[in-house]
């Protein structure tokens, strides 16, 4: 991802200036680059970051929450969204509670916040809460397992799952690349088996059938 961004930036510059650029992107820098939140925290206070699970490091509640039949992601960052969230959950008084009145207070009392929210969210299903929260403008979404993910109407509509033909296994399902250009290119066949095209390739090199049989007899391939 970082390499692609660098390449696109260099191409854009070449388009405007006519000059090329050397684009570098190491795995080390890429790994550290993905830790921007925790790196910024450590550089500011030199305190070792701790594991947060699905919790956001700067906002609460902004995390996965349990429901009656699964899990839900809630992103109530900011006071306006938090007020709508509390009201949608049937507890507008949470906004007046000193423990939850501000984001700073909610971060400091995260365990208590999670406890009261879980007590409410576990009374209804994930789909019920998605409908309620979306209706009030609270960012949210279901947390899928794999069966739910591949059954999702949008995943099916986008044709993310494709099939390749295998002589032994039949139609083999796989996920295509997420990038689509125009109609896209579909993989119709699986990778060749070891040595499957030996005769064809050796034939292009001028190796005849008799020599091929000799090579096979000698165990060359």
What are these regions (language model features)?
Residues 1-6, 10-16, 193, 197-221:
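N-terminal helix-loop segment corresponding to the beta1-alpha1 unit
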Residues 135-188:
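A glycine-rich dinucleotide-binding beta-alpha-beta segment and adjacent secondary-structure elements
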